[in-house]
């Protein structure tokens, strides 16, 4: 006698932590009814290294090399937030030239991060060609980083009160050449991808986040702006010299995976616009506070000693962090990267709390993937742009 199954058995599948579309060591426990997703539970912590506790046992200068391991594809932003924290707490002013250099480096890093989001995202949904295209342009950005900082990744370039070294001779012209080269390439990506019918089938209407949901889930960055909210910390907080340049907040109102793709394409164009303007008006002068002091003291200053300037260049000073608390944030490629820290009249911070955008943005996928197909998980997760280094810390 043949028994007919009256109820469907649900299947639990573990995606990751070694699945190529996880972009790191993320594990998803997915409950399936055939191809339909019933539930999804992210499992985090595989890349936890105790970054917050390490910060509480290091001076800011000692801690700087560690922070580039959070979001290792946009390291300039982790460095920026780490030096901004004590600068804001102790009201340390930075020279104008240093602020412009920082701004240029941040926008180059934003482009590099968005490029390395675009390639794997397209590979996740079946398009291999863009991956090789983006590597071509990304290498040029890394060449610029290497010329200015000595490192292609993990730059360790920002310092309290400025940057480590000034831009080398010819770097500005080289960067301008890249800007004029890269802008048409973004248009090339759009021609190749945006109206492709297979691409549109995979992303249009997939992973929709409404305006209200984006606010309720505390999303930030492209995840927030793709849902119709014009919120960019570069405009809101007025940090560095962004207010002196002409640029627009990129946003979309549909809230789906296609909107998040279009927004990041627009942000790359806007970043090129910011870099061009900054390169044309970048002022001269010192690139860090120590250099300001050296110039102010005159010829008799100890900062003019050969040993101080060349043999063992004096690092940024280690100073006591006053007994108060502060929250600082920057607009990173993934969203709002923030640090809440508490000083205790000590050279070490008493508390160093990291607010990573990826961790917050990763809370919404379980809701987005319900009642979707299994293949849509890769599309939704890819459109969020997560890096597990900053999620797990």
Curated annotation (Swiss-Prot):
It comes from Cryptomeria japonica (Japanese cedar). NCBIfam families: PRK06075.1, PRK07415.1. GO terms for cellular component: chloroplast thylakoid membrane. Gene3D superfamilies: Cytochrome-c3 Hydrogenase, chain B (1.10.645.10). SUPFAM superfamilies: HydB/Nqo4-like. Keywords: Chloroplast, Membrane, NAD, NADP, Plastid, Plastoquinone, Quinone, Thylakoid, Translocase, Transport. It is found in: Plastid, Chloroplast thylakoid membrane. GO terms for biological process: photosynthesis, light reaction. InterPro entries: NADH_Q_OxRdtase_suD (IPR001135), NADH_UbQ_OxRdtase_49kDa_CS (IPR014029), NDH1_su_D/H (IPR022885), NiFe-Hase_large (IPR029014). PROSITE patterns: COMPLEX1_49K. Its EC number is 7.1.1.-. It is an enzyme of class 7 (translocase). NDH shuttles electrons from NAD(P)H:plastoquinone, via FMN and iron-sulfur (Fe-S) centers, to quinones in the photosynthetic chain and possibly in a chloroplast respiratory chain. The immediate electron acceptor for the enzyme in this species is believed to be plastoquinone. Couples the redox reaction to proton translocation, and thus conserves the redox energy in a proton gradient. This is NAD(P)H-quinone oxidoreductase subunit H, chloroplastic. It comes from the Eukaryota. NDH is composed of at least 16 different subunits, 5 of which are encoded in the nucleus. It catalyses: a plastoquinone + NADH + (n+1) H(+)(in) = a plastoquinol + NAD(+) + n H(+)(out); a plastoquinone + NADPH + (n+1) H(+)(in) = a plastoquinol + NADP(+) + n H(+)(out).
């Amino acid at each position: 006698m043949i028994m007919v199954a009256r109820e469907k058995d649900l299947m639990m599948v573990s995606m990751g932590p070694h699945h190529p579309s996880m972009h790191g060591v993320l594990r998803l426990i997915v409950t399936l009814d055939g191809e339909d997703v019933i539930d999804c539970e992210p499992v985090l912590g595989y890349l936890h290294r105790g970054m917050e506790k390490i910060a509480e046992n290091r001076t800011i200068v000692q801690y700087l090399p560690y922070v580039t391991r959070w979001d290792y594809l946009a390291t300039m932003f982790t460095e920026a937030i780490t030096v901004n924290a004590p600068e804001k707490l102790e009201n340390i002013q930075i020279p104008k030239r240093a602020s412009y250099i920082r701004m240029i480096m941040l926008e180059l890093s934003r482009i590099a991060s968005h490029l390395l989001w675009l390639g794997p995202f397209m590979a996740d949904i079946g398009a291999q060609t863009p991956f090789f295209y983006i590597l071509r342009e990304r290498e040029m950005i890394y060449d610029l980083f290497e010329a200015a900082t000595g490192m292609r990744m993990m730059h360790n370039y920002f310092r309290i009160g400025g940057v480590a070294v000034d831009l080398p001779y010819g770097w500005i012209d080289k960067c301008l050449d890249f800007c004029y080269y890269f802008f048409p390439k973004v248009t090339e990506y759009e021609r190749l991808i945006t109206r492709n019918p297979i691409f549109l089938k995979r992303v249009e209407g997939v992973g929709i986040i409404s305006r209200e949901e984006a606010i309720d889930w505390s999303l930030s960055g492209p995840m927030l702006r793709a849902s119709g909210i014009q919120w960019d910390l570069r405009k809101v907080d007025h940090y560095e010299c962004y207010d002196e340049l002409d640029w627009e907040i990129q946003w979309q109102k549909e809230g789906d995976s296609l909107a998040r793709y279009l927004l990041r394409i627009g942000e790359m164009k806007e970043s090129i616009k910011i870099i061009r303007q900054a390169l044309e008006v970048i002022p001269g002068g010192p690139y860090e506070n120590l250099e300001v002091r050296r110039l102010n003291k005159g010829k008799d200053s100890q900062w003019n000693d050969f040993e101080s300037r060349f043999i063992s260049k004096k690092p940024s000073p280690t100073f006591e962090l006053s007994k108060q608390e502060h929250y600082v944030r920057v607009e990173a490629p993934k969203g709002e990267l923030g640090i809440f820290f508490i000083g205790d009249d000590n050279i070490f911070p008493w508390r160093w709390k990291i607010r990573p955008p990826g961790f917050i943005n990763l809370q919404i996928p379980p809701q987005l993937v319900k009642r979707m197909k299994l293949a849509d998980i890769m599309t939704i997760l890819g459109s969020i742009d997560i890096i597990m280094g900053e999620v797990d810390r």
